[in-house]
């Protein structure tokens, strides 16, 4: 326990383990700042952010500014008199006026090994790009996009078949552990902030649904990485008989054919030709249907070798 007045800023499930860790350590979390409640899912039911739920379970006051950069939002946070602000996956850019409020600055927990993968979606992009290692970095925030001085890093391997959901769950715990270590070592005066080398950076922009469209002319391993990095959201997809087909689990194989051509169908999956090699789709979801293992899908949908997956209304694969 540091004894500091801490304001916690975060929104999604990824931030919850870090907030719980602060609470379990007995830290004085004087308020939680999170995004407004928003409609979610098919029913568009208005739901609170996961971080808000955790805060309310522990009786911590919650602020939900629509725009944290507005003067009234900044003054409300200033009125909390924080010694430190901890930020993890908050979802809005913090202005300098807010960063300057706490006595000991603002610490961000970022889900990559900075300076690589600055930006909103580091978990997705490190998998899409075929990385075999990633990690978490704590840093002192400045006005740039994940450009602040680094405090600590902790790395973790990425499994060959691991998707974003699995990596998310592990990294959220890793981030909580690293923040606790960061606070302890800062209190002992053991940490010296390290400048980032901008020459080594790459960016991880926010994911868009259209990023999930599979180009079957690409290499099979590259498409597998895309599927892994897009699962569970926004989802990798193609089209079958002009219907959207989401693809969730695949394995590489050595088949050949026209890109997007269905090579075989069986209990183990649906093999589809790529630009180089092939992919066996093990789990999928056709538009308007449930997510199913390939064998169960084929029991209700008559798919034949020689068919094509590709863009909607296309007569050939992408």
Curated annotation (Swiss-Prot):
GO terms for cellular component: cytosol. Keywords: Protein biosynthesis, Transferase. This is Methionyl-tRNA formyltransferase. It catalyses: L-methionyl-tRNA(fMet) + (6R)-10-formyltetrahydrofolate = N-formyl-L-methionyl-tRNA(fMet) + (6S)-5,6,7,8-tetrahydrofolate + H(+). It comes from Citrifermentans bemidjiense (strain ATCC BAA-1014 / DSM 16622 / JCM 12645 / Bem). Its EC number is 2.1.2.9. It is an enzyme of class 2 (transferase). PANTHER family: METHIONYL-TRNA FORMYLTRANSFERASE, METHIONYL-TRNA FORMYLTRANSFERASE, MITOCHONDRIAL. (6S)-5,6,7,8-tetrahydrofolate binds at residues 112-115. CDD domains: FMT_core_Met-tRNA-FMT_N, Met_tRNA_FMT_C. InterPro entries: Fmt (IPR005794), Formyl_trans_C (IPR005793), Formyl_trans_C_sf (IPR037022), Formyl_transf_N (IPR002376), Formyl_transf_N_sf (IPR036477), Formyl_transferase-like_C_sf (IPR011034), Met-tRNA-FMT_C (IPR044135), Met-tRNA-FMT_N (IPR041711). The keyword Protein biosynthesis applies. The gene is fmt. Belongs to the Fmt family. SUPFAM superfamilies: FMT C-terminal domain-like, Formyltransferase. Attaches a formyl group to the free amino group of methionyl-tRNA(fMet). The formyl group appears to play a dual role in the initiator identity of N-formylmethionyl-tRNA by promoting its recognition by IF2 and preventing the misappropriation of this tRNA by the elongation apparatus. Coiled coil: none annotated. Gene3D superfamilies: Formyl transferase, C-terminal domain, Formyl transferase, N-terminal domain. One of its GO terms (molecular function) is methionyl-tRNA formyltransferase activity.
């Amino acid at each position: 326990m540091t004894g500091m007045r801490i304001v916690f800023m975060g929104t999604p499930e990824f931030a919850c383990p870090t907030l719980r860790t602060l609470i379990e350590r007995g830290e004085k979390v004087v308020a939680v700042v999170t995004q407004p409640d928003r409609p979610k899912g098919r029913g568009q039911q208005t739901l609170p952010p996961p971080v808000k739920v955790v805060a309310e379970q522990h009786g911590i006051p919650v602020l939900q500014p629509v725009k944290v950069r507005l003067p009234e939002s900044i003054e409300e946070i200033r009125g909390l008199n924080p010694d430190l602000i901890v930020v993890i996956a908050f979802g809005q850019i913090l202005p300098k006026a807010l960063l300057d409020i706490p006595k000991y600055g603002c610490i961000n927990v970022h889900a990559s090994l900075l300076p690589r993968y600055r930006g909103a979606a580091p978990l997705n992009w490190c998998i899409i790009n075929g990385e075999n290692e990633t990690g978490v970095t704590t840093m002192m925030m400045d006005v740039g996009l994940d450009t602040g001085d680094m405090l600590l890093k902790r790395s973790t391997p990425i499994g060959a078949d691991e998707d974003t959901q699995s990596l998310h769950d592990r990294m959220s715990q890793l981030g909580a552990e690293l923040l606790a270590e960061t606070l302890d070592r800062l209190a002992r005066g053991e940490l010296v902030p390290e400048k980032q080398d901008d020459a080594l950076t790459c960016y991880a922009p926010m994911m868009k649904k259209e990023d999930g469209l599979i180009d079957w002319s690409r290499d099979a391993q590259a498409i597998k990485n895309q599927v892994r990095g897009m699962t569970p959201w926004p989802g990798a997809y193609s089209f079958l008989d002009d219907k959207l087909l989401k693809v969730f689990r695949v394995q590489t194989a050595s088949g050949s054919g026209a890109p997007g051509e269905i090579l075989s169908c069986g209990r183990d999956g649906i093999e589809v030709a790529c630009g180089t090699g092939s992919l066996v789709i093990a789990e999928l979801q056709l538009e308007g249907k449930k997510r199913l293992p390939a064998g169960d899908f084929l029991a209700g949908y008559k798919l034949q070798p020689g068919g094509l997956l590709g863009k909607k209304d296309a007569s050939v694969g992408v």
